[in-house]
């Protein structure tokens, strides 16, 4: 795992799961995509901060659980610079905590799910339409199963009448 790195940015010291737990998620995603070197910034922020980011970049004036920013290498940057950098993930722990309670999920399980979700966005996965969402959700379910975490979408499907 020496070639996989998460830069934790948690200036206000919000409570988060162990770094090893999240690094294991990165390892799973990297292995699945045959990635041997990867670096990610994980920014831990308040609800107010993520609401501002959500408004600025997604035109949604409300807090959200996670926002991912895939790294786009600027033209002219030498190939050997930032080759392994996937991008930035911003997470609001208070939103995750509320969601976990509302959905009767273990908090660490929900963290792992949402972090994997964000990592997949950095690799180009999306859920803009039903087909893309199905591909992304199925991959999340598969990766979470390797961590011993149940399908996080089952309860939501039942609530949504799917």
Swiss-Prot record:
Its EC number is 3.1.-.-. The keyword Nuclease applies. InterPro entries: MetalPrtase_cat_dom_sf_prd (IPR023091), YbeY (IPR002036), YbeY_CS (IPR020549). GO terms for molecular function: metalloendopeptidase activity; RNA endonuclease activity; zinc ion binding. Transmembrane segments: none annotated. Pfam families: YbeY (PF02130). It comes from the Bacteria. One of its GO terms (biological process) is rRNA processing. Its main location: cytoplasm. GO terms for cellular component: cytoplasm. Belongs to the endoribonuclease YbeY family. This is Endoribonuclease YbeY. It comes from Francisella tularensis subsp. tularensis (strain WY96-3418). The gene is ybeY.
């Amino acid at each position: 795992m020496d070639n996989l790195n998460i830069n934790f940015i948690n200036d206000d010291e919000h409570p988060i799961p162990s770094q090893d737990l999240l690094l294991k998620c990165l390892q799973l995603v990297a292995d699945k995509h045959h990635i041997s070197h990867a670096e990610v910034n994980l920014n831990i922020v308040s609800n107010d901060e993520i609401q501002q980011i959500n408004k600025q970049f997604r035109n949604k004036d409300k807090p959200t659980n996670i926002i991912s920013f895939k790294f786009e290498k600027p033209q002219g940057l030498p190939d050997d610079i930032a080759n392994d950098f996937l991008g930035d993930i911003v997470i609001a722990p208070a939103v995750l905590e509320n969601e976990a309670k509302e959905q009767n999920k273990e908090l660490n399980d929900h963290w792992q799910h949402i972090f994997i979700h964000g990592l997949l966005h950095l690799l180009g996965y999306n859920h803009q339409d039903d087909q893309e969402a199905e591909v992304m959700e199925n991959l999340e379910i598969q990766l979470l199963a390797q961590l011993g975490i149940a399908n996080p979408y089952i309860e939501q499907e039942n609530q949504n009448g799917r």
